[in-house]
Amino acid sequence: MLANRNIVHVLDDLAMGGVTRALKNFEHPELAAMGEHKTIDIRKGRIRASGANDIAIVHFTANWKKLGWLLDLRLRGGFKRIILIEHSYTQGYEASEVLPKRRFRQMLRLAYRLVDQVVAVSQTQREWMIAHKLAAPDKIIAIPQSRICTDLLTMPPCNRDTGPLQIRAFGRFHKQKGFDLLIKAMARVPADLATLKIAGTGPDADQLEALAHGLDHVDICPPFDSPEAFLSEADLVAIPSRWEAFGLVGTEARAAGRPILAARVDGLCDQLDGGGFGHAPGSVSSIVSAIYRSANAANINERGRSSRDRAAVEYDQMISNWCALLSRS
């Protein structure tokens, strides 16, 4: 561990799943050796550095009210550097959820001006930031998210033969994830072409159950304890999100040797590469077309293996990139 350096992770919601998963990455031995990591809830009071080399890493989602927190960290925090990870905002989020966009972008410009580096969690997110001049290009660093997937990397890979395409999807039942679009697409797909199982829970559960009513080739399942069993019979994993900063579901699917059928949006663009099947975001008809393409593809097994090979190295790349960033003087 580097002597006399604290790395303070600043949050305002300790229950956010994506953020808590990101924090686990800093337990990796190489990152743990970069300093003493501490997690602090900014709602409990002002946050101050205790040494000249301390670094603050901001995980909370910026808005107009929270600019005061960033201003206090900048002017009075005493940190050598402040790094903000953009877990939330993307081009897809802006297109789906934001009006007026001009005011939203101005808020982000002010927030990013108050920190030393902005970490985008995908290359596509970084490109969106640069395109709209939210911060200088040399201030924005892309460090794509990942997780340890040893359990999934050792699963038997996709072995599609004949019969209906076995599609799996999982995640929070929320508008963001686009499962309503996926079920509507399945209503246009015959049962002898594809079947779908969706696992999860969330505020849109009743809506999804209603959409799936009468569709014998669509099953809504409770959350699972282990993805291995849920994915064991999968030919591919669908990720029809309206927005997705990165999308760890894609990492897990690819590590399991399953290609993804995903919206061409935000961080999912980074994961489609040559192994996935892309569709237009928010488009039921485009999802239908992607299902037909994947069901008729003769190389799904090869696509799965290619996707796994890439996923296998992404975690180590992420750790290396974070070590390089934290090592900067």
PLM ranges: what are they?
Residues E209-F224:
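Nucleotide-activated donor-binding/catalytic signature segment of Leloir-type glycosyltransferases, i.e.
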Residues P100-V118:
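Membrane-proximal helix-turn-helix segments that form the acceptor-binding/catalytic region
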Residues G274-S285, Y292-A298:
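Conserved acidic donor-binding segment of nucleotide-sugar-dependent glycosyltransferases
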